[in-house]
């Protein structure tokens, strides 16, 4: 048969089975649309989670550390951080910007109730992504730059029953075994950002240092934001080697968030003084990365089901 005859036969079959062909074409179009929608939804959720996490929780690469007065005591501190930052800038020319963050934990007490908070000490003027990620419901984000201020999330403010300009008391254990307290004013209340905002609050950096009795050259971690986030593993490896060569003691890489090391790993290690800990966003995100992986698995499973249906 000639190609023309084949084409004529195919055309007659299509015209004789119009309803079936329309149904099949509609099913293919619907499944294709669902696959595109599912991919866009998954990609959007993952991108939003990563942006929120790398704003509130971690940098692309982090230079944190632990300071031990005795082998049994541990504090998440980086002493003499300006010197560390100077070496970091030499080793990592790919840095887009740097955020210096204090790390702490405190019990927040209002007039009616209390709750535990993980505190991040920030200099809000040096946090370019805060205005994009944090949606302020009450107050002004800029006011977090004033001494003695704290930013709470909506769920925390509801639980503590406080509003902007109310005062709460923070009680925090220090590495010397005593509890310090500080009265802080609620400068702003931001809308919740999922699980990330359930336990974290932000306090003006100098206020956090005063709460813990730390000097101005001490911080919790240096968050590095890179021009290309995919370079983070290579940058972290290079930075560990560079800091060790420059004379700092550097911990071996371990894919755990700092708070797990603080509670489980470091207290049992027999050393004192300062050690630096270089991590990536994947290391610090821990369970959040597991959630993203589960989301990808569910997406792949749904794609297979849709393809089988077709």
Question: Regions from the language model: what does each represent?
Answer:
Residues 33-118, 145-146:
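Hydrophobic, regular-secondary-structure patches
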Residues 251-308:
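Peri-transmembrane interface segments
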Residues 18-45, 289-310:
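Hydrophobic alpha-helical transmembrane segments of multi-pass inner-membrane transport and secretion
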Residues 84-187, 207-214:
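Short acidic/glycine-enriched loop/turn elements at secondary-structure junctions
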Residues 162-266, 270:
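Basic-flanked hydrophobic alpha-helices used for secretion and membrane insertion
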Residues 8-17:
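Cytosolic juxtamembrane amphipathic/interface segments immediately preceding
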Residues 1-8, 274-278:
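Short, membrane-interfacial amphipathic segments enriched in basic
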């Amino acid at each position: 048969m000639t190609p023309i005859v084949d084409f004529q036969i195919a055309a007659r079959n299509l015209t004789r089975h119009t309803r079936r062909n329309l149904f099949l074409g509609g099913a293919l179009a619907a499944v294709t649309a669902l696959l595109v929608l599912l991919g866009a939804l998954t990609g959007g959720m993952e991108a939003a989670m990563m942006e929120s996490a790398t704003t509130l929780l971690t940098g692309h690469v982090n230079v944190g550390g632990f300071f031990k007065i005795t082998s049994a005591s541990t504090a998440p501190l980086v002493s003499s951080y300006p010197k560390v930052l100077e070496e970091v800038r030499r080793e990592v020319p790919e840095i887009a910007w740097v955020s210096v963050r204090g790390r702490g934990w405190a019990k927040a007490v209002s007039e009616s109730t209390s709750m535990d908070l993980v505190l991040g000490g920030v200099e809000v003027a040096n946090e370019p992504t805060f205005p994009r990620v944090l949606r302020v419901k009450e107050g002004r984000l800029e006011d977090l730059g004033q001494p003695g201020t704290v930013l709470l999330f909506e769920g925390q403010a509801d639980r503590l029953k406080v509003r902007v300009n109310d005062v709460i008391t923070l009680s925090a254990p220090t590495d010397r075994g005593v509890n310090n307290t500080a009265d802080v004013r609620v400068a702003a209340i931001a809308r919740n950002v999922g699980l990330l905002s359930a336990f974290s609050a932000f306090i003006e950096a100098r206020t956090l240092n005063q709460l813990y009795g730390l000097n101005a050259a001490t911080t919790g971690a240096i968050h590095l934001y890179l021009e290309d986030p995919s370079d983070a593993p290579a940058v972290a490896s290079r930075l560990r080697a560079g800091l060790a060569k420059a004379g700092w003691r550097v911990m071996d890489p371990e894919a755990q968030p700092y708070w797990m090391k603080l509670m489980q790993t470091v207290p049992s290690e027999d050393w004192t003084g300062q050690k630096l800990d270089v991590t990536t966003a994947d290391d610090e995100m821990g369970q959040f990365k597991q959630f993203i992986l589960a989301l990808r698995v569910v997406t792949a499973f749904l794609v297979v089901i849709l393809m089988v249906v077709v």
